[in-house]
Amino acid sequence: MVTAPGQLESHYAPNKALRLNATEAGSAEWLIGFGEVTGNVTLSASGDLVEAAAKLFDLLHAADANDRPKIAIAPIPRDGIGEAINDRLRRAAHR
């Protein structure tokens, strides 16, 4: 039984293909960076997972709205809140 939106198998998902754990942008990809992986935008240049969680959906929407046909996102550590971030990303990539 689903009692909250976060329990759905597919949560917010961009309209574009989303590649996880990218360390660089591929052809025609908009890269969302994290930590040492720089991108067109970044969830957190310092690797702060709380900052990354706060910016996640805004940056996914921005990536979906840009002119590149694909989205890539840097690896996010699975420590603490990073586990929840990775869960949301997995759901967003599941289309």
Roles of regions detected by a PLM:
Residues 2-95:
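A C-terminal functional module that forms or caps the active site or interfaces directly
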